[in-house]
Amino acid sequence: MQVSLITCTSNSEETLEDCCNSICAQTYGNLEHIIIDNNSNDNTLNILNKSKINNQRIFQQKSKGIYGALNEGMKMSNGKIIGILHSDDELIDKEIIEIISKKFLENNLDVLFSNIFYTKKNNINKITRKWTSNLNEGIQQNNDLIQRINNGWMPPHTSLFFKKNLLNEIGYYDESFKISSDYDFIIRLFKQNNLKIFFLNKFSVKMRSGGISNKSFSNIFKKMREDIIIMKKFKLNAFITILIKNLSKIKQFF
């Protein structure tokens, strides 16, 4: 079963080599790496061309935003399973994709999510926060997950792996949302009936701080506005929870 990892790059030379090395080190052989590059003019392409990833495909295009680029990557992918790995993030160890693939095969899964580490922007080995689901490992009940989402819970999209054919049912990232499209996407995904969704109680990714959603005060408030639109769309009642979660990000600036 082929797994496709989608990475978007835009002058990503500072962190890209570590990202690629974490993919190259994987013990799982049937792995595809799709890169959507925003016409980088630094050393990004040299790093990609020198990487030792066996099945890597690079597509250059003028920026359509992060979600437009991810959509292009998913459309270009050949894998049965899709995951997202940003250019400043790393897979946790060399066996994680093999473990994830095995879970899909053993349990005939549609979706899998796991735990992730958040790290300092300039030191990915310095853990600043841990996201854990507080669930027991195994197949989850859709209704239970939707209830959690209704209370403000949401797994990070970088921890998520899903079958590509689900895109035919739920669609791709909504590009009208510039910051919170992953929130909208995951709700649509988890609201599908009769999916086999598995929680892997293992850390899968180290994710650097400083992403688009929390790089500035302005983006934090833009994200809150988009979150509210999405909550109204799905008739969720998590306004206070989302407000607190977004406002809590402000402390990183002090």
Predicted regions mapped to residue ranges:
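Short, well-formed alpha-helical segments that are part of the catalytic scaffolds
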Residues: 11-25
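Short beta-strand/loop segment that forms part of the nucleotide-sugar
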Residues: 31-39, 59-62
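A conserved acidic beta->alpha catalytic loop
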Residues: 37-46, 86
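Glycine-rich, basic loop-to-helix element that forms the pyrophosphate-binding segment
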Residues: 60-77
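Short aromatic/hydrophobic "clamp" motif used to bind/position activated sugar donors
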Residues: 82
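Conserved donor NDP-sugar-binding/catalytic core segment of glycosyltransferases
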Residues: 94-130
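Conserved nucleotide-sugar donor-binding catalytic segment
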Residues: 136-222
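Catalytic core of nucleotide-sugar-dependent glycosyltransferases
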Residues: 207, 215-241
